[in-house]
């Protein structure tokens, strides 16, 4: 569409919307409310309706515009990158008497955005230190059935037709050796998983292996029983970890080469018969020599990757995969927050202190009653994108930023956090109705009489009339990536938060509409009792509060109200922290989190925690 036609179309739409009430109107048509720009300036275009062009003037942020004959206007104004949230207020006044006829206001974000449905790349980090790997070793152990009896079933022939006795070169006594009852057994086995550079070592120790053999003689060779035992058996293997190609929210684990199997303390003991006959002494060593490689080969075959780089895995690799599936954050956290959270892995990095799972992240809202869905209140915004901040993916060490040991770390970038806030606002976050007010002496019911103490024009309303202040976000709160003004872990900015003062009656009567922008510090802490990341809003300076009066049916004097509201709101707005939904952290591997520290690891907001048994 040509620019002129597009402008005329907007004006036509505006006129149609205004028909029926014939009220004067001003509308900012471009850019869209909540849009993003990296330019130093922004061009504001708009139009008026139901007003005499020759008798009105329009100012945007108190800068005069030139009205075209068709009622349209355009003006270029600065975009403040430091503020991020940039409001633009269009005010139409009648020239003849100076009366304000109409207002419109939008916010433009200085910066880039992540479009709805797109991923924030490299935006979530999940760290599992070696101490955390120690915590999941029992889970891996429980998933592997190390059955020596299956490796050497009863009846397996170990030695066949061995010539035990010979006379003048002729064999006069032969022996077969077969696995006997009771079946081969072990007393226990242990697993030690240890992260190394670019791989994870998975070392198994098998204790008290016992194998009973029947030595079956023929000719002059006797028959007897032999018990072989090994104090311990070491089975050492290395494993490579990477995102699963078919479903990258999970970890794919593959054995590197074959496991190395070695015995310590192999012993022999006759259990029956005459096998201490001197002529067959060498037989014992032969059996021991043949049984060891058979057991070694059996264990290697059992524990090796059956098809190399193919889809099948070794038992230990498969068990590690299954255990690590317990740290997928996509489903559990998303459902708890009533959002659709996708976090496919882009890497699994192993180092000598632990392993780090890095994810791209997408958080969206979905209307419905299913898992991860919500039923937003009427009037909730449907936002085109969220504020994005370029940040480097963090590294992790053996200790937290504060130098404390920990088992697990969970970090999220500013961009991913803002996606989460966007999705939650679309689902109703920060919607509230206030029916009480605290002026420093305790909560009081909100009535026309109490509000008249602040806004004298409410004295014209019956003082007993109950009032309600309806708070409605039009945009998502956003984190800028900076620290808060009071040293808090983050800085949060909220744009165009609407407060409508209405009569709380069957048929509401609107008295006042105020748009509020503010800047504050965001605190974060972990509640180990509820297993949630909790948020708080720090103190707010009046200078960090911007207000605009968009509706004034009570006909209050706007100048004094605009001067007084920032101070009043700076005292009330920190309570908004209670409206920020806590971030539920799921259990991992059946273990609960015990908070160690919440801090910025690099740029990421990171929870460091230990894994402890649940109640």
Residue map of PLM features:
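C-terminal motif of bacterial Sec signal peptides marking the signal peptidase cleavage site
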Residues: 18-20
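Ser/Thr-rich low-complexity repeats and stalk/linker segments
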Residues: 24-34, 39-110
């Amino acid at each position: 569409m040509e620019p002129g036609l597009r402008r005329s179309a907007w004006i036509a739409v505006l006129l149609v919307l205004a028909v029926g009430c014939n009220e004067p109107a001003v509308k900012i048509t471009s850019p869209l409310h909540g849009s993003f720009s990296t330019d130093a300036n922004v061009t504001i275009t708009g139009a008026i309706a139901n007003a005499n062009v020759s008798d009105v003037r329009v100012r945007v942020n108190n800068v005069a515009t030139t009205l075209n004959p068709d009622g349209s206007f355009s003006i270029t104004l600065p975009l403040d990158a430091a503020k991020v949230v940039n409001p633009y207020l269009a005010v139409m006044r009648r020239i003849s008497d100076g009366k304000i006829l109409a207002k419109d206001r939008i916010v433009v974000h200085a910066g880039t955005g992540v479009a709805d449905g797109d991923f924030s790349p490299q935006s979530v980090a999940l760290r599992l230190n070696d101490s955390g790997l120690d915590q999941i070793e029992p889970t891996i152990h429980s998933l592997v059935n190390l059955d020596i009896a299956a490796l050497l079933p009863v009846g397996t022939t170990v030695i066949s037709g061995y010539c035990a006795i010979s006379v003048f070169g002729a064999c006069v006594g032969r022996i077969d050796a077969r696995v006997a009852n009771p079946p081969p057994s072990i007393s226990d086995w242990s697993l030690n998983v240890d992260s190394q550079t670019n791989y994870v070592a998975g070392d198994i120790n098998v204790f008290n292996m016992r194998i009973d053999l029947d030595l079956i003689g023929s000719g002059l060779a006797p028959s007897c029983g032999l018990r072989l035992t090994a104090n311990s058996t070491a089975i050492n293997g290395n494993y490579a970890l990477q995102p699963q190609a078919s479903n990258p929210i999970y970890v794919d684990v593959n054995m590197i080469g074959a496991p190395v199997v070695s015995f310590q303390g192999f012993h022999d003991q006759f259990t029956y018969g005459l096998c201490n006959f001197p002529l067959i002494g060498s037989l014992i060593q032969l059996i021991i020599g043949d049984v060891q490689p058979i057991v070694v080969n059996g264990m290697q075959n059992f524990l090796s990757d059956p098809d190399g780089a193919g889809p099948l895995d070794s038992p230990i690799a498969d068990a590690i995969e299954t255990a690590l599936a317990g740290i997928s954050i996509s489903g559990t956290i998303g459902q708890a927050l009533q959002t659709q959270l996708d976090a496919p892995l882009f890497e699994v990095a192993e180092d000598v202190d632990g392993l780090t799972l890095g994810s791209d992240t997408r958080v969206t809202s979905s209307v419905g009653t299913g898992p991860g869905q919500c039923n937003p209140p009427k009037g909730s915004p449907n936002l085109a994108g969220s504020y994005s901040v370029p940040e480097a993916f963090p590294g992790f060490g053996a200790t937290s930023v504060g130098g404390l040991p920990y088992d697990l770390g969970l970090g999220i970038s500013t961009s991913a956090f803002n996606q989460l806030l966007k999705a939650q606002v679309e689902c109703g976050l920060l919607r509230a109705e206030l029916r009480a007010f605290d002026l420093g002496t305790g909560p009081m019911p909100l009535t026309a009489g109490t509000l008249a103490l602040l806004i004298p024009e409410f004295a014209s309303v019956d003082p007993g009339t109950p009032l309600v202040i309806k708070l409605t976000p039009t945009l998502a709160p956003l984190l800028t990536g900076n620290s808060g003004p009071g040293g808090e872990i983050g800085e949060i900015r909220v744009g165009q938060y609407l407060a409508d003062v209405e009569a709380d009656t069957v048929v509401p009567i609107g008295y006042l509409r105020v748009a509020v922008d503010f800047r504050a510090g965001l605190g974060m802490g972990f509640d180990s009792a509820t297993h949630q990341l909790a948020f708080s809003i720090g103190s707010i300076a009046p200078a960090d509060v911007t207000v605009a009066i968009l509706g004034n049916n009570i006909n209050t004097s706007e100048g004094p109200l605009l001067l007084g509201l920032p101070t009043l709101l700076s005292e009330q707005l920190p309570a908004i922290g209670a409206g920020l939904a806590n971030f539920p952290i799921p259990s991992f591997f059946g273990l609960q989190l015990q908070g160690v520290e919440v801090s910025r690891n690099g740029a990421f907001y990171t929870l460091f925690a230990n894994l402890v048994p649940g109640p």
